[in-house]
Design a protein with these regions (language model features):
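Non-catalytic signal-transmission and effector/linker regions of two-component phosphorelay proteins
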Residues: 1-26, 130-158
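Receiver (REC) domain active-site loop signature in two-component systems and cognate sites
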Residues: 78
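Acidic catalytic/metal-coordinating carboxylates
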Residues: 55-59, 82-85
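Hydrophobic/aromatic residues positioned on beta-strands within the core alpha/beta folds
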Residues: 102-103
């Protein structure tokens, strides 16, 4: 399978250690910093998540149009397309995947004028492995709760 700008990450040695609840979760990590991207990917894989990685916002947007993800973790300042630009496209396309913005400078001025661009969570860089995993778990729990509520509401009308 050819993926332009997307780095597919799989680790068969981690497969035996997968947490049951995480094994079906697919996360997209978007970051132009190779070290941060690879460390994030490794931590998530070791915790049982299926992970895809993109080297910038444009590659991340391409992945979002091609594959289904349960969560996106993105930097903001990247070449070709920023994390905010990718988030704006995601929201305009009415994609409901939750987004964690992992950045050293969160552009709060953007959120003041465009509140719909707020990510579901922010992760201040540099961040620890524990901070990353706790934020991922918190956002996924919140999204699961929201999805269950929506499904319950719609089940009454179907």
């Amino acid at each position: 399978m050819k993926k332009l700008g997307i780095i597919s990450i799989e680790d068969s040695s981690a497969a035996s250690n997968l947490e049951q609840s995480n094994s079906s979760r697919r996360i997209l990590v978007v970051d132009d910093d190779n070290d941060v991207r690879q460390l994030s990917v490794d931590v998530l894989i070791d915790s049982g998540y299926e992970v895809e990685a993109a080297k910038d916002g444009a590659a991340g947007w391409e992945a979002l149009q091609t594959y289904d993800f349960d969560l996106v973790i993105t930097d903001n300042k990247m070449p070709r397309m920023t994390g905010i630009d990718m988030l704006e496209r995601l929201r305009a396309a009415r994609m409901t995947v939750p987004v964690i913005m992992a950045t050293s400078h969160l552009p709060t001025h953007e959120f003041a004028s465009k509140p719909w661009l707020r990510p579901d969570a922010a992760l201040q860089r540099p961040f620890s492995n524990d901070d990353l995993l706790e934020t991922v778990k918190r956002v996924l729990r919140g999204y699961d709760s929201y999805s269950a509520h929506i499904n319950l509401l719609f089940s009454r009308y179907l």
